Amino acid sequence: MNGLVIDTSAWVSYLAGGGKPELVEPALEDDRALLPPVVAAELLSGKMSPRQRRALMALLDDVILLQADQEHWYRVGDLRAALAAHGLVVSTPDAHVAQCALDLGADLLTEDAIFSRMASEVPLRLVR
């Protein structure tokens, strides 16, 4: 099975008791859940109690943290430029998440509509 890059929006829904547990939990159990570094930072930026923070960090510690080398960041810039040429302005964090999925040929779990718009221009495989 393919890896599953999980975007911040999908994590937030899942952690709140919603989202797609039928996709997230098997990916966690099978070591297919993939965590872009920016998603970890975004999740840890949220307001939470010290206990919630420890629980979140314990969960994230069990997820594969993706590495982003210099070439990856060049591809992120190229992706943003290509999308902008089609009139689609994408933030660097969202382009990074998309590029992580593209680099690995992984599926992307998200609830953010920007990724659907991106998928109309690049071969991004979204699961919902």
Please report, for each region that a protein language model flagged, where it lies by residue.
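Acidic, PIN/NYN-like endoribonuclease modules and their adjacent C-terminal/linker elements
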Residues: 1-3, 98, 102-128
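Short, well-structured N-terminal submotif of metal-dependent ribonuclease cores
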Residues: 1-35, 45-58
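Histidine- and aromatic-rich ligand-binding microenvironments
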Residues: 6-7, 35-36, 89-92, 112, ...
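A generic structural signal for short hydrophobic patches within well-formed alpha-helices
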Residues: 11-12, 40-43, 115-116
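A general structural signal for well-ordered alpha-helical segments in protein cores
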Residues: 21, 36, 40, 53-56, ...
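Conserved beta-strand segments of alpha/beta enzyme cores
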Residues: 32, 64, 123-125
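Short, hinge-like loop/turn segments at secondary-structure boundaries
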Residues: 50-54, 83-84, 125-128
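Active-site neighborhoods of divalent-metal-dependent phosphate/nucleic-acid chemistry enzymes
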Residues: 64-109
